[in-house]
Regions:
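Canonical P-loop GTPase G-domain recognition
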Residues: 188, 194-248
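Alpha-helical scaffold elements adjacent to nucleotide-binding pockets in ATP/GTP-utilizing enzyme cores
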Residues: 93, 130, 155, 159, ...
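Residue-level signal for inorganic ion chemistry
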Residues: 14, 83, 145, 192, ...
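Generic beta-sheet signal
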Residues: 80, 166, 191-192, 227
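Expand to "…catalyze enediolate/carbanion chemistry for C-C bond making/breaking, isomerization
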Residues: 2-15, 51-55, 60, 214, ...
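Long, well-ordered amphipathic alpha-helical subdomains in the mid-to-C-terminal portions
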Residues: 226, 237-317
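Nucleotide-state-sensitive switch-loop elements of NTP-binding domains
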Residues: 2-49, 54-57, 62-152, 159-169, ...
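Flexible active-site lid/hinge loop adjacent to a nucleotide/diphosphate
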Residues: 156, 169-197
Length: 318
């Protein structure tokens, strides 16, 4: 099947074509790039929701409830669950999230797990492209759930239109909430497992941290929504908070929303240019295994990483 054929089937919303397309952008760099070229002009309509937070915060259950709520509103939904990579298979450890199987018979919901493949920011290299596939396939909402790796989750801002930071009482989140990186990426805070002891203290801690920030007229102040994802309590309120942020971004701060899209595009462009340069360097300039040899020299403290990088860049320019 050609990229054009597959693109046509993705645009028609065929589930098998969507699955094949996401596999392509994960595993076949050239074919994946050709596919994105074919569908890119038909993207930009879906609303991307990033859900992040520490391990054990109940993010998967929360996403499952979010899907149900959006479907109740008749929105079509795509989910990308970014999982840790298995060191043995290279695949996503948790697979296609058994906790979301209640939606498996719904053709208007597409759920896919993707492996981080060692990417420290928590997002798979191909997550952005997978979101484009779901966007092109006509999904109204695309939810990206990330692995919980703390402040490295700032990367989610570059992919999502709204970032939902999920916290849970009793996991040290009173301290975590004070960390600047988490504060900077949150558009909406969720205190999940809100029926647990300490939930109200956590809400107070987050409110106290928000109070330290100065918000100008028209600025968005992240709301704090308390949920119990296992029962669905608070999930409609969370969806309303997300929709309020979307309306605010569109009406009150369109320039800021556009700037966020530009930052996202620039990040992806830099990522592709950097990867392309490195691929060219390895293919055309370096001897087989030379990059690994240089890395070994850095690890052995025989050369510093800046000098090594400068030397390789100079050779690439020659």
């Amino acid at each position: 099947m050609t990229s054009a054929d597959l693109a046509g089937r993705v645009l028609a919303g065929e589930p098998r074509a969507i699955a094949r397309a996401i596999s392509l952008v994960e595993d076949d760099e050239v074919a994946g790039a050709n596919l994105i070229r074919a569908i890119f002009s038909r993207t930009g309509r879906a609303y991307l929701i990033g859900v992040t937070g520490p391990p054990g915060a109940g993010k998967s259950t929360l996403v499952d409830r979010l899907v149900a709520e959006f479907r109740r509103q008749r929105a079509t939904v795509g989910v990308i669950a970014v999982d840790p990579t298995s060191p043995f298979t290279g695949g996503a450890v948790l697979g296609d999230r058994l906790r979301m199987q209640s939606h498996s018979g719904d053709e208007d919901v597409f759920i896919r797990s993707m492996a981080t493949r060692g990417h420290l920011g928590g997002l798979s290299r191909a997550t952005g492209d997978a979101a484009l596939v779901l966007d092109a396939a006509g999904k109204d909402v695309v939810i990206i759930e990330t692995v919980g790796v703390g402040q490295d989750e700032v990367e989610i801002v570059r992919t999502a239109d709204v970032s939902v930071v999920t916290l849970v009482p009793g996991a040290g989140d009173e301290v975590q909430a004070l960390k600047a990186g988490i504060m900077e990426i949150a558009d909406v805070f969720v205190v999940n497992k809100g029926d647990r002891e300490g939930a109200d203290r956590l809400v107070t801690a987050v409110e106290g941290t928000l109070a330290l920030h100065s918000y100008g007229t028209g600025d968005w102040r992240p709301p704090i929504v308390k949920t119990v994802a296992t029962s669905g309590s608070g999930v409609p309120e969370l969806v309303r908070a997300i929709e309020q942020f979307r309306a605010h971004a569109g009406a009150q701060a369109p320039a800021r929303a556009e700037a966020r899209r530009r930052v996202r595009a620039e990040h992806r462009l830099r990522e592709l240019v950097t990867q392309g340069f490195l691929d060219r360097l390895e293919r055309s300039v370096l001897a087989p295994g030379e990059l690994s040899d240089v890395a070994a020299r850095i690890a052995a403290r025989e050369i510093d990483p800046y000098s090594a990088a400068a030397s390789l860049i100079a050779r690439g320019r020659a």
